[in-house]
């Protein structure tokens, strides 16, 4: 994006090692916690803000969403879907917390503290009063639209939810 579209990209990363990797690749990134450090950015600092598969790891996801939509005009949020059929079956039949490609950790070392499904995130948007502009589900490496008529199936088979959101 930076090279081909002349996009100004900046990031916040909590892991010191990942910050160093980003800097080595020529990316502008600061070490910090989005839950706390987004406050330092002025309102509407960015056109788009991206939060990739970390919402479930924050203590207060509602604060993070509010801050994303304060500093960015729009936000792209991706979540691992805990409503996926494989996750449900592991818990039901094995009686253990599932390990999948989008949920690769054991229960005791996972950063995930909030289990969220695609349907939960849609409901969350109503509760938090933000608008979902576009929603997609990743199913077997294919991306498809989520709608009211197919949300049951996307919630059941989707491995990842991808949402473009903005303030109402």
How would you name each of these model-derived features?
Residues 1, 68-71:
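Short, conserved loop/helix-junction motifs that constitute active-site signature segments
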Residues 1-37:
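Class I SAM-dependent methyltransferase SAM/SAH-binding core
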Residues 8, 45-47:
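Structural signature of beta-strand start/N-cap positions in the alpha/beta core
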Residues 37-43:
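Short conserved loop adjoining the S-adenosyl-L-methionine
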Residues 44-45, 71:
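Alpha-helix C-terminal capping/helix-to-coil transition sites in glycosyltransferase folds
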Residues 48-60:
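A short SAM/SAH-binding and catalytic strip from SAM-dependent methyltransferases
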Residues 62-67, 74-167:
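S-adenosyl-L-methionine-dependent methyltransferase catalytic module, highlighting the catalytic core
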